[in-house]
Amino acid sequence: MSKKSFSDYKLSKEIVRALTGLGYDHPTEVQGEVIPVALQKKDLVVKSQTGSGKTASFGIPLCEMVEWEENKPQALVLTPTRELAVQVKEDITNIGRFKRIKAAAVYGKSPFARQKLELKQKTHIVVGTPGRVLDHIEKGTLSLECLKYLVIDEADEMLNMGFIDQVEAIIDELPTKRMTMLFSATLPEDVEKLSRTYMNSPTHIEIKAAGITTDKIEHTLFEVIEDEKLSLLKDVTTIENPDSCIIFCRTQENVDHVYRQLKRANYPCDKIHGGMVQEDRFEVMDDFRKGKFRYLVATDVAARGIDIDNITHVINYDIPLEKESYVHRTGRTGRAGNSGKAITFITPYENRFLEEIEEYIGFEIPKAIGPSKEEVMKEKAAFEEKLHAKPIIKKDKNADINKGIMKLYFNGGKKKKIRAVDFVGTIAKIKGVTAEDIGIITIQDNVSYVEILNGKGPLVLKVMKTTTIKGKQLKVHEAIK
């Protein structure tokens, strides 16, 4: 952890204020390395573990560098998954809260028309998955003429998921005069080639862990036949009694099967895989993040980009077939300086996958023998007690910064020739209110939304009921959340 403070980076007071509200005390190692170079607008290739504060390392400079006055997108962030796109958009919104930075997330299986409408509004930063971003570019609904900054996040995962061709197609459409940042946990040849082809003399930054995986994770291997996996899973979880655990399966069918069996055994659990509708996936991840349940059964869709710091255990119910996936899965634990455990089940026919993984991570995973019946019985009472305990809901790390914000609805927008500056000018004249109390402003054709910060919402709402904007008296009320 760096001894530096974020105020050492010559950031605007609005960004520093947001970081303070988010509880960012000191830059992590990756933030300390990346932010100063990014603020100089130099291209960057960053090799860094997940869970290292990476999103803020590009989110902070992006929010600092974009110009609020410009209405068209100035930055594009590409992510491999929808979950990560939403997560990054939320993080950027919170970092840029007091600078009134407007971020939009675009991804598949979400209505295109709604995204098109959002992109017509003032938007500073667009975060999205490659397929949907390319759709918007091809249909002319994502303006690129003012784009100055590109971030490719989780580049190795883009490669694994077959998105590199789409990423290249997107880059070919972007202005050549731009700054590009590429982030990856690993740097396979195709990712290196991407940086050589599309980047301008990039600065390379590598945040070294002890080997490929962090030394905060304790790795263990259990040999088991397929039919006895479920029994072993129940024994291991009884002994370990984890606070928060992800159980990874190779297929959606296996996820469904394991989830049903654990649910039947009264485990506080849920599941996530690519076959579920998007809203359900988001809801499951949000509940898991808040601690509403302790066991998440998942395919690799959940292995990247989910910002949850306190996962104590990862169990590979099915050993991953790709060595990189082992790093990505186990990287869900041992984050943000916490320790964690990574437990892997292996059947007699899967040794070749294990050999590849061990060669890749640079050490042999210690083998263990499954718990005895006596050991399981000894821990059963404590396990059962925790199983039936009321969940402790975790505090949302964004709660403090979002406290005291009221979103106001006005029944007028572009068609009444109303602009963001009109709201700022009018509201800032209210006694006891300044421009710093005004957050993100969204102006649509017939309606507008204005965030009022610092607990000043009720005052502004009361005054604006009898105050005109550009000579027009608009209806105003608190927006429905």
UniProtKB/Swiss-Prot annotation:
Segments for region (Involved in 23S rRNA binding): 406-481
Catalyzed chemical reaction(s)? ATP + H2O = ADP + phosphate + H(+)
Gene knockout outcome: Wild-type growth rate at 10 and 30 degrees Celsius, no change upon exposure to H(2)O(2) or diamide.
Read off the Pfam families from this record.
DbpA (PF03880), DEAD (PF00270), Helicase_C (PF00271)
EC number(s) recorded for this UniProt protein: 3.6.4.13
PANTHER family per the record? ATP-DEPENDENT RNA HELICASE DBPA, ATP-DEPENDENT RNA HELICASE RHLE-RELATED
Protein purpose: DEAD-box RNA helicase involved in the assembly of the 50S ribosomal subunit. Has an RNA-dependent ATPase activity, which is specific for 23S rRNA, and a 3' to 5' RNA helicase activity that uses the energy of ATP hydrolysis to destabilize and unwind short rRNA duplexes.
Name of the molecule in the record: ATP-dependent RNA helicase DbpA
Q: Which organism is it from?
A: Bacillus cereus (strain ATCC 14579 / DSM 31 / CCUG 7414 / JCM 2152 / NBRC 15305 / NCIMB 9373 / NCTC 2599 / NRRL B-3711)
